[in-house]
Amino acid sequence: MLVRSDPFRDLDRFTQQLSGTAARPAAMPMDAWRDGEQFVVEFDLPGIDEQSLDLDIERNVVTVRAERPDVDPSREMLATERARGVFSRQLVLGDNLDTEHIDACYDAGVLRLRIPVAEKAKPRKIAVNRGDRQQTAISA
């Protein structure tokens, strides 16, 4: 059996996923890294009104929602390439993060979350008793 293949179909599908379409908006791009005793996550949200941002946390899942409203229908649009509608992204956080003290800041189209490392996840010393009852500290 022969299957006809278009070599550009996969490339076209990949491009649509990156740029998004009206029916399926592009994903909220993000970067995440550890900076000392905290994790930092940045989401690119250009053109999003700060009032439309919504952050929720339930257990260890952070949900970020934002909305870019539709274009005024009275406009005669010549091009409509920017994704519109509601955007949503969820992050599952590990138990080693302190979800009670998340700091969120939105500036210049970038939403930045700073999530501190939980105290229970930080290195600490544990005392070890010897047979003669002397204590020696080791790193854990």
Curated annotation (Swiss-Prot):
One Pfam family it belongs to: HSP20
Domain of life of the organism in this record?
Bacteria
Entries under InterPro entries matching the protein: A-crystallin/Hsp20_dom, HSP20-like_chaperone, Small_HSP
Family as reported in the entry's similarity comment: Belongs to the small heat shock protein (HSP20) family.
List each copy of the sHSP domain by range: 21-131
- Please state what the protein is called: 18 kDa antigen 2
Q: Which SUPFAM superfamilies match?
A: HSP20-like chaperones
Its annotated function is as follows: Not known. This protein is one of the major immune reactive proteins in mycobacteria.
